[in-house]
């Protein structure tokens, strides 16, 4: 019986510890392309577009880049056009 009581006590402590913790949520920053003096999204600006492409050449999602949905669509279209015009590579080579 002692073993079962100890097991239930430790389980109660674990549950109590979970409820005692406060969860901290980080406040999301705004869209970096919606602020005043932000660069214009254009397929002719590969320096800007390459910031939103991963090391392997894939477009980064907005949850990583914190770009709003409207600007994310413009970015995706600009990256696709820049790839077709050979301003950006489709796949980056590993170094």
UniProtKB/Swiss-Prot annotation:
Family matches, as SUPFAM superfamilies: Ribosomal protein S18
Domain of life according to the entry: Bacteria
One GO cellular component term noted in the UniProt record for this chain: cytosolic small ribosomal subunit
Gene Ontology BP annotations: translation
Gene Ontology molecular functions: small ribosomal subunit rRNA binding; structural constituent of ribosome
InterPro entries: Ribosomal_bS18, Ribosomal_bS18_CS, Ribosomal_bS18_sf
Keyword DNA repair in annotation: no
Key word Ribonucleoprotein present: yes
Entry keyword set: Ribonucleoprotein, Ribosomal protein, RNA-binding, rRNA-binding
Subunit and interaction comment: Part of the 30S ribosomal subunit. Forms a tight heterodimer with protein bS6.
Function per UniProt: Binds as a heterodimer with protein bS6 to the central domain of the 16S rRNA, where it helps stabilize the platform of the 30S subunit.
Homology family: Belongs to the bacterial ribosomal protein bS18 family.
Record-given protein name: Small ribosomal subunit protein bS18
Species name: Rickettsia rickettsii (strain Sheila Smith)
Encoding gene (name): rpsR
């Amino acid at each position: 019986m002692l073993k079962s009581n100890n097991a239930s006590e430790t389980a109660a402590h674990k549950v109590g510890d979970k409820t005692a913790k406060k969860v901290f949520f980080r406040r999301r920053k705004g869209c970096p392309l919606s602020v005043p003096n932000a660069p214009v999204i254009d397929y002719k600006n590969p320096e800007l577009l390459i910031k939103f492409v991963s090391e392997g050449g894939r477009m980064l999602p907005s949850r990583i880049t914190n770009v709003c949905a409207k600007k994310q669509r413009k970015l995706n279209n600009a990256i696709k056009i820049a790839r077709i015009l050979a301003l950006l590579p489709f796949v980056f080579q590993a170094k």
